[in-house]
Structure formats: C-alpha cells, structure tokens
Amino acid sequence: SENLKIDTMAIELQYLLVSEEPCKTFNSTPLTEELYEIGTKLDYMENRLGNDNPSVLQMKEYYSMLELRHWLFVKKTKKECEINRTYILYFYSNEGDCQTCEEQGYVLSYLHKKYPEMNIYSFDINIDNVALNTIKRAYNVVTAPTLLINDKNYEGFMSARKIEETIR
C-alpha cells in the first residue's frame, strides 16, 4: 500500500511535468503504462483483501481520480496535438449485480495488449465521488457494464470484435 502511494505520487508529478509540453512529451511518456501497472496492483489488493476492504476502496477512489486526470490529459492532447488516439472509459460493478462485468474486463485487457496505444480507464460505477458522478451524469452512465468509447455511450457487454468495429 505504501509503494502504491509512492507510485501514485510519482504519476501525479509526471503528469504535471508532461502537461507543460503535452505535444512534445505525449508519445515518450510512460504515464499510461504506469497507470496500468498501478491498476494491476490495485486488482491484486482487491483479490487479496476483498472488494469491500476500506483500504482497497480508498485506493480505488484515489486511482479513479488519477485515471480521470489522465483521460482529460489524453483528450486535451488528442485535440491540441492532432493525435489519433482511442480512449475507453469502462464502468463496472463488483456488487454482484453485473453478470458480464468480469468478462468485459477480460475483453478490455485483451484489447489493451493488442493495441497498447489505446487508453482504457476502469471505474467502479458504485463509487460515490463528485468527479465520477459528474462524468456519469454528463455521459448518462446508469448501468454496468457501460463503455464510453471516444465519448460515445455503449451500454451492455461488447465483444472485442464489436469494439474494434466501433473504433475503426
């Protein structure tokens, strides 16, 4: 947990440094990969300590804020630097009310490996946080799984093929 805090602080600092010259540093930044690694560590903590562990929930909320900030950065650089980049916001639930969420997670992991330049952000739909609630309202996210692919809302499970067709 302490290593996770250090990693997240490093990402915050790197974000500030990169945002000074977004077009110059966009392709060279390991920011995306580090965010992905922290997500993997968070998954490990969730599996070891449980979804409802207070430390896990707090870290998950903090990680969600890092993801939102990174997503905003990617959106900004995509527009300012004219970079063709796909981003997906994935809303899931761990509360037993989403039969296809785990499978959707596997599909997105597969796509991340196949297309490393694709940015995928995962959010627990049940986290009650002002920033996440703003995104959910703005994009009408009401159920899990929901994918926001380049700002378009897709409710329900999507296969890898269907997602690939959407981003072409």
Predicted feature locations:
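Non-catalytic, surface beta->alpha helical segment in thiol-disulfide oxidoreductase systems
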Residues: 1-6, 143, 148-168
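Non-globular targeting/processing and membrane-anchoring segments
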Residues: 1-86, 142
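Solvent-exposed, acidic/flexible segments
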Residues: 35, 59, 97-101, 156, ...
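Solvent-exposed, polar/charged alpha-helical surfaces in well-ordered, non-transmembrane soluble domains
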Residues: 68, 106-110, 161, 165
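Local sequence-structure signature of Cys/Sec-based thiol-disulfide redox active-site neighborhoods
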Residues: 75-117
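Solvent-exposed loop/turn segments at secondary-structure junctions
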Residues: 94-97, 126-130, 153-155
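General small-molecule cofactor/ligand-binding pocket signal
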Residues: 121-124
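Short, intrinsically disordered low-complexity segments
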Residues: 130-142
